[in-house]
């Protein structure tokens, strides 16, 4: 039986809103740490100079980094209105699965 120390870190997919209202999608094992990096300009180059930033959505991914990367790729392919529906809670990932096929 695995102890807590032996369990793999959960992965998360998240969306950050930039000052220009654009949505940035990324993955991490620690959302608050990664968002703090983005705010300090030490995160993704795509977000540098785009502040103030707001963390608007995150979702834990149970199946590890590979699954998180695949979901990130799929979310990046969504339209702005579909991403906004996720943020507003008007759509869930499983509802958007049809789009991914």
UniProtKB/Swiss-Prot annotation:
Q: Which Gene3D superfamilies match?
A: GIY-YIG endonuclease (3.40.1440.10)
Q: Name one Pfam family in it.
A: GIY-YIG
Q: Where is the GIY-YIG domain?
A: 9-85
Tell me the domain of life: Bacteria
Which InterPro entries does the record associate with it? GIY-YIG_endonuc, GIY-YIG_endonuc_sf, UPF0213_domain
Family the UniProt entry places it in: Belongs to the UPF0213 family.
What's the protein here called? Answer: UPF0213 protein VC0395_0675/VC395_A0575
């Amino acid at each position: 039986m695995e102890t807590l120390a032996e369990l793999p870190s959960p992965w998360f997919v998240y969306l950050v809103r930039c000052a220009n209202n654009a949505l940035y999608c990324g993955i991490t094992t620690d959302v608050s740490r990664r968002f703090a990096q983005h705010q300090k300009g030490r995160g993704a180059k795509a977000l540098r100079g785009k502040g103030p930033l707001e963390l608007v959505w995150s979702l834990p991914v149970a199946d590890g980094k590979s699954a998180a990367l695949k979901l990130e790729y799929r979310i990046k392919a969504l339209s702005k209105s579909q991403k906004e529906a996720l943020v507003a809670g008007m759509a869930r990932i499983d509802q958007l699965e049809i789009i991914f096929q």
